[in-house]
Amino acid sequence: MTTTSRRGLLVAGAAAALARPAIAQGRYPQRPVTIICPWGAGGGTDQTARIVAAVLEKDLGQPFNVVNRTGGSGVVGHSAIAQAPPDGYTIGIITVEIAMMHWQGLTQLTPRSYTPLALMNEDPPGVQVNASSPHRDIRSLADAIKASRPGQLKASGTGQGGIWHLALVGWLQAMGLPGDHVRWVPSNGAAPAMQDLAAGGVDLVTCSVPEARAIIEAGRARSLAVMAPQRNPIFPDVPTLKETLGIDYSTGAWRGFAGPLNLPREIASTLTAALDRVYRSNEYIEFMNARGFGRTWGNAEEFAAFMDRSNRAMGEAMRAAGLARG
């Protein structure tokens, strides 16, 4: 081999050695990622975001920091996700309200305002009362609601026109009452609503039982029923509306992860694959099961189709409930 040839090989080898770190440096993520949560700390959406962030951090080797951006019945946080730079360093957990808010004229955002990454959770609502409430079962509460004056009783659970509000409206209508017979007090999520319930600020809260669990276990509230086809195995003593009232009414919230539109395909694919690993991880399964949160998986394409169906269904439900505008 000539000296020139040897020099050529050495140069090529050095170039290859330099190229390898360059390729590695191009891998996503290279710095911390922000996960925006549109709802308050301690609620089901916040808890789901934080366990996912913790496992993503281990999986992808960079911090994933959850930031709560509340307000506007969910509009503030959902807008922040949609308006983030499409570089993968700000993503978010989006909720069923994104299929509802635009029907009320609160925002122009729809499920198609995002790059879907993965669907990871679905939960039905429960009906909670203060621990000192005279109502020990759902029939007693239902009778009291029917006997009350319009607007006399107050309820909370999420923002105006949010999924837990719609759950209450549907239940009232199923009992033959107007959807606004119980006055809705908007909140930034289930956690602050449950605190308000425990303090006596409202008469009942509709939210998932897992979201209410901390206040219930502290002896400050109790759950009377769930709006689901069957009982939650983590809360076997909480009956369904159908069992107790003969009302076959159920609904639920969903949560998934998304980025802004035009997120690069490589980054979106990396995140969806990582979220799939999170979903199948022991940490996520044990966390969700221990709290009674539902686990539902959909990849990016499945999540997009799921949101389209949810958008149509919520539009129909909100028009029927008189909550839609236009």
Question: Language model features by range: what are they?
Answer:
Residues 30-32, 265-326:
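An extracytoplasmic/periplasmic, membrane-proximal ligand-sensing/linker region
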Residues 2, 8-24:
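N-terminal export signals
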Residues 53, 57, 61, 82-86, ...:
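Sec-exported extracytoplasmic/periplasmic mature domains
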Residues 33-35, 42, 49, 66, ...:
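Residue-level signal for nonpolar/aromatic packing positions in well-ordered secondary structure
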Residues 24-112, 177-203, 297, 323-326:
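N-terminal (or domain-start) structured segment
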Residues 122, 211-280, 309-312, 317:
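C-terminal lobe and pocket-closing loops
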Residues 96-106, 165, 169-176, 199, ...:
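A ligand-binding cleft/hinge motif common to bilobed small-molecule-binding domains
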Residues 83-89, 103-192, 241, 254-287:
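Hinge/capping helix and adjacent helix->loop/strand transition within the periplasmic-binding protein
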